[in-house]
Amino acid sequence: GGRGGAASSDHPGLVELLAWIVDSGRGVGISSLRADRVALKPDIPRLLRAGGYSTLTVASDAAAQRLRREIQKGTTEAHLLACAEAAREHRYRVLKVYMMVGVPGETADDIEELVSFTRRLAAIHPVALGVAPFVAKVHTPLDGLPFAGIKVVESRLARLRQGLRGARAELRPTSARWAWVEHRLAQGGPAEGEAVLRAVETGGSFAAWKAALGESRLR
């Protein structure tokens, strides 16, 4: 079987390649897809299902449409709704949607929009919401932007958990604490490199990382 990542959905010959793989009797899967590509090319979810894939995985990027525009992501609610319809039509087990919380400028209203929209998706087909705290990556357009903070991210996740109760939606969050560690390392320098060694030497727990990174901040 073959497997690709999100960039695979940008390949101009993807549909033809998937058809060739499926027609030859092989299995195929793509770890995640751009939602707009799935919406605009309905053969993609059909062929992936024929290739034995049972989870249709797409990226939503941010909690609200306004935020997706601000971080220049082309995904719209219409694209995501089309993905849910495709997951239902081709009998996928679940639609998995990756998205971020804690994007700079995000408000409580944006989280409410995410709750209501996820419930709309879940009314069409079961949803697994993979939620990761926003961490600015070096050498990307969002490099240098701040981390929302552990307490803010945890409150966002708690609201999502509460708001999705009773819906066909499972919340699969990434730890706010470990996202903070990732942020410090992504935006750090040599002092953070030394902190990695100290954290590992002192057991590697979050408390060890927090202490080690706290020391590096004081240097």
State what each model feature region is.
Residues 1-128:
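Conserved SAM/AdoMet-binding glycine-rich loop
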Residues 88, 103, 111-219:
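Auxiliary Fe-S-binding modules of radical SAM enzymes
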